[in-house]
Amino acid sequence: MLFCSVRILFIISSKQLVLISETEVTTTLTLHTTHKIESPTANPPQSKKNLFVIRMELLSTINLLAIALVLLVVPKIYGACRILVWRPWMLSRRFKKQGISGPKYRILYGNLREIRKMKNEAKLMVLDPNSNDIVPRVLPHLQQWKSQYGETFLYWQGTDPRLCISDHELAKQILSNKFVFFSKSKTKPEILKLSGNGLIFVNGLDWVRHRRILNPAFSMDKLKLMTQLMVDCTFRMFLEWKKQRNGVETEQFVLISREFKRLTADIIATAAFGSSYAEGIEVFKSQLELQKCCAAALTDLYFPGIQYLPTPSNLQIWKLDMKVNSSIKRIIDARLTSESKDYGNDLLGIMLTAASSNESEKKMSIDEIIEECKTFFFAGHETTANLLTWSTMLLSLHQDWQEKLREEVFNECGKDKIPDAETCSKLKLMNTVFMESLRLYGPVLNLLRLASEDMKLGNLEIPKGTTIILPIAKMHRDKAVWGSDADKFNPMRFANGLSRAANHPNALLAFSMGPRACIGQNFAIMEAKTVLAMILQRFRLNLSADYKHAPADHLTLQPQYDLPVILEPIDG
């Protein structure tokens, strides 16, 4: 192929030179004739010799350029063919030998067009509020391909192979037993702008170092000190509600998902970073807009380097990212320039202490701190806001359970006592409701892991570079694991703890499991208990007739049309 390309360019170059030479010869002869009249001593053979030398030098230069061009282009063409054609064909063939099939790969796009089409159609669905079978709406492609190809199948996100596995025992191996062989999967640049390249996405030794530094911030002793801040922020939300109804004790219409997002953003900003309400809300607003941009790009085709092009969406993402970075830098600078003797013992203080460490395994750079701040600002408010939102919906639909929880709160906290860490730990029924809410409406629909080397997983041979997708929204509704009532709201399944709630001890994956399980899960549960206990002390929750049950995948599971709730004040 290389020889043919050079030969073609050589022939083309030769023909062009012949034309050039003929023109030059004619011109030279004309000049020579004129010169001959003027100077009888001219030497025609010498001119022809010079012309021949020029021609050969030019020909040699062009051929060298042609060879260099071929040497540059051919590897690129080979690499593109390998990624676009040969690798998908080879991997599909390798999995087919193991009895695993899936939708047909299409060059460049994979199955992205099919996924986009199915998701757009599913967005038009409005479900029965009493139906918890949300998978056909939020994961329509996985639902359809599972019915066609079985529990384990292969599909393509562009040129990225994705192996969908629904087996709980294999999930345990991926997330726990063999977690060192599975890193976090490749992430789109716009998502990193939103959630930061922090603990969620870093891999290898960087993850080990970050986790070791951050663990103390989420110890139970530290969490107990944060409950008063959670209470203060919740009272601030109640005050806003009171202003909206002009101080009158009457029923109130509230878009509760929006309210919970603002509340949890306030709590994470105050408890973890010691920032003011205004600064925390600025970060929250910018991340909310970034989240919309990222959700819209979930099924877009990704090209390496496209994030550097000044497209309208990229310009919007850059602008929002700069706003987030500026807000976080102001929070960090305020802590660095404070007159306090140390940086404090909250999350930000622990990270800034690490920045001044002389030990490499305990050190964090300022850039890493900024990325971790993005991570905890986003994940820290999004997880709890979603848990509170869906729990509120379920309690509004199941008034009997709402009354059971209110009675428990009155027994442990009284009707007006402020909840603290000790009373929160006694709210056992509330804990079962939260676990059931996380099972049915967990914030994350899938867990993704990338095979870092060729390996054996159960009876499967997994090639290096394969992305494993665990469809936990589907796995949480597996009747073989959770029983015949898997689609029903039944908190009592968790009455004897997580390990006995299903036929597999690690069936609940809302916070993942293993070494990379969510570092902030205890913070999220304590925060949710504090907020819900205070709400149940003061209000009855009723679902508005305007509510449309349309859970949607916006990076996390959210109600597409928010959650309109009627707050009914409790007398006395």
Swiss-Prot record:
InterPro entries linked: Cyt_P450 (IPR001128), Cyt_P450_CS (IPR017972), Cyt_P450_E_grp-I (IPR002401), Cyt_P450_sf (IPR036396), Cytochrome_P450_Monooxygen (IPR050665)
Membrane topology listed for this record: Single-pass membrane protein
Necessary cofactors: heme
Record Pfam families: p450
Single GO molecular function: oxidoreductase activity, acting on paired donors, with incorporation or reduction of molecular oxygen
Expression (tissue specificity): Highly expressed in siliques and at lower levels in flowers and rosette leaves.
Protein name: Cytochrome P450 709B2
Organism of this sequence: Arabidopsis thaliana (Mouse-ear cress)
